[in-house]
From Swiss-Prot:
UniProt-annotated location(s): Mitochondrion
Keywords annotated in UniProt: FAD, Flavoprotein, Mitochondrion, Oxidoreductase, Transit peptide
Organism: Oryza sativa subsp. indica (Rice)
Subunit structure: Homodimer.
Gene symbol of the encoding locus: D2HGDH
Stated name of the protein: Probable D-2-hydroxyglutarate dehydrogenase, mitochondrial
GO cellular component terms, semicolon-separated: mitochondrion
Regions crossing the membrane: none
Protein family (similarity comment): Belongs to the FAD-binding oxidoreductase/transferase type 4 family.
Length: 559
């Protein structure tokens, strides 16, 4: 009873404990910021970068592939890694001509066929300005039937294509490498049905994740995934990359949430797997081939996905730890103490916080007293406000008294909670403002997860700054190396070391971002030769002309 009486006198800042001091002695307990405020927005908008508009030719009949390839090679070489130097344009692909454009206009209309240099230029480049293709054509289908006709024609002509959603990826998977035709799914953004009893959403692939989140939340449900880029990314792209995100610790991967898919194969065949059944044991579950295949086996056009119930009680805490071992122990304690209400466990090192404070507008450091080494963001969601609050209070009390938490802040309103999430979600945005950023998305056993950050700092020295952050709850490290410019010298210190080190830990070189172009020829660090060969066989079976998102996912040497 004394604890609950003291709860009315809560302070926002917990403050570090003195030797032998307890939180009970201070009368400090966390504050829950209210069921009514559950649906606060975590989305942050990324200011559009000033991209140079490369002047592409409008005469699509001229075969200037070599010039295009040279231009593309130079951009890739300066941008991200040595991998692009080994990718040559497949000479088996046809070159776009005026007859092709005329055909596409016959099925899409003039508005669905974009040749404007400025618009195509934007679609040719990723949001970080690191990956750039030289496509001269952007197609905007509005139905599965139109996607089918496009692919059937491109397959017969052997025109390579790249499917594109919100273009928020980090590994060059959603932009052309050379002159591939870009197929944007943005016009396919309809919500088809929603089952209010079972929480099953059926929609088209071009739906923006944030729009879907708003829709299902109004129905009393939430999307099973949440990403910093949810205001731009498409659900089709999320599924094609098997995006993980911030709710993975609670709801798992999309392999468990996606119930059905509609996919258009390379030859235009529409594969209808759009079931909404929770159980279906009739033969092979083919949808799993396309979840995470990055558009290399087929283009996802419709999705049926299970959405969890929206829970009324939400708490967000921003904590500091003195060392990484404390972060590990805090995670274990959170799993044991918070159990079923734990919905996010994110960690950041102090370099991330410093970067966020410097480059993100409108944020402030929740713990400005001392420069701690590590920070942890914990979110809980549950159905009983008083029960959830009591569990979080007890957990934080024990964690501070055990020395796992050095300091902490509990969000008391939407603004504070949004600020906490803005810091975590804005790290990627802030990192690109430094100049050059080498991004690695690794899955590593939690006890060894931060070791590679420290080793990378030793290797890089004063050439750059190394950041470590990510989803500690599922062993996903985002390793960022920042520098003022890209250089071969820096790259030599990073690769192949980062892949070799991860492989020795039996980790994955791609936890959630996919392989794309960046890591297609690095797949052997995470997969056996037998597994890669089987993947190659599947690719050749479903896409024998290899027109779907070429140069991505699998090494060119095996195709």
């Amino acid at each position: 009873m004394a604890r609950r009486a003291a709860a009315g006198l809560l302070r926002r800042h917990l403050g570090p404990l003195a030797a032998g001091e307890t939180l009970q002695a201070r009368g400090m307990y966390p504050k829950q910021y209210g069921a009514a405020n559950h649906a606060f927005s975590r989305f942050y908008s990324i200011q559009g970068q000033q991209r140079s508009l490369y002047g592409f030719r409008t005469n699509v009949e001229t075969d200037d592939t070599q010039q295009s390839a040279r231009m593309n090679f130079e951009v890739q070489k300066r941008s991200f890694s040595s991998a692009a130097a080994h990718v040559q344009r497949n000479p088996a692909y046809s070159v776009l001509n005026s007859d092709d454009v005329s055909y596409f206009k016959s099925i899409l209309g003039d508005s669905g066929v974009v040749q404007d240099e400025d618009r195509v230029s934007v679609a040719n480049m990723d949001w970080m300005g690191k990956y750039k293709g030289s496509s001269q054509l952007l197609l905007l289908p509005k139905s599965t039937a139109e996607v089918s006709k496009i692919l059937s024609y491109c397959n017969s002509r052997r025109l390579a294509v790249v499917p594109q959603g919100g273009n928020t990826g980090l590994v060059g998977g959603s932009v052309p490498v050379y002159d591939e035709v870009i197929i944007s799914l943005g016009g396919m953004d309809k919500i088809i049905t929603f089952d209010n009893v079972n929480g099953i959403l059926t929609c088209e692939a071009g739906c923006v994740l944030e729009n879907l989140s708003s829709y299902v939340e109004n129905k009393g449900f939430i999307m099973p995934l949440d990403l910093g880029a949810k205001g731009s990314c498409h659900i089709g792209g999320n599924i094609s990359t098997n995006a993980g995100g911030l709710r993975f610790i609670r709801y798992g991967s999309l392999h468990g949430s996606v119930l059905g898919l509609e996919v258009v194969l390379a030859d235009g065949t529409v594969l209808d797997m759009l079931t909404t059944l929770r159980k279906d044991n009739t033969g092979y579950d083919l949808k799993h081939l396309f979840i995470g295949s990055e558009g290399s086996l087929g283009i996802v056009t419709k999705i049926a996905i299970l959405t969890p119930a929206k829970l009324p009680s939400t708490n967000v805490a921003f904590l500091s730890c003195n060392d990484y071992i404390s972060c590990q122990k805090l995670l274990l304690a959170a799993r044991r103490s918070l159990g079923e209400i734990l919905s996010a466990f994110e960690f950041m090192d102090r370099h991330c916080i410093n970067l966020a404070m410097k480059y993100l507008e409108g944020v402030h450091n929740p713990l400005p007293v001392s420069p701690y080494n590590f920070y942890v963001l914990i979110e809980t969601t549950g159905s009983d406000e008083s029960y959830d609050k009591a569990k979080l209070e007890a957990f934080l009390l024990r964690s501070m008294e055990d020395g796992l938490v050095a300091d902490g802040v509990i969000a008391q309103d939407i603004s504070q909670a949004s600020n906490f999430w803005r810091i975590r979600e804005g790290i990627s945005e802030a990192s690109v403002k430094v100049g050059a950023v080498y991004k690695y998305d690794l899955s590593i056993p939690v006890e060894k997860l931060y070791d590679i950050v420290e080793e990378m700092r030793s290797r890089v020295g004063d050439m750059g700054q190394v950041l470590g952050y990510g989803h500690l709850g599922d062993g996903n490290l985002h390793l960022n190396i920042l520098s003022t410019k890209y250089s071969d010298k820096m790259l030599a210190q990073i690769e192949p070391f980062v892949y070799e080190w991860t492989s020795k830990q039996r980790g994955s070189i791609s936890a959630e971002h996919g392989l794309g172009l960046m890591k297609a020829d690095k797949i052997h660090y995470s997969k056996s030769s037998e597994a890669v060969q089987l993947m190659t066989s599947i690719k050749k079976l479903l896409d024998p002309n290899s027109i779907l998102n070429p140069y991505k996912v699998l090494p060119q040497s095996v195709l």
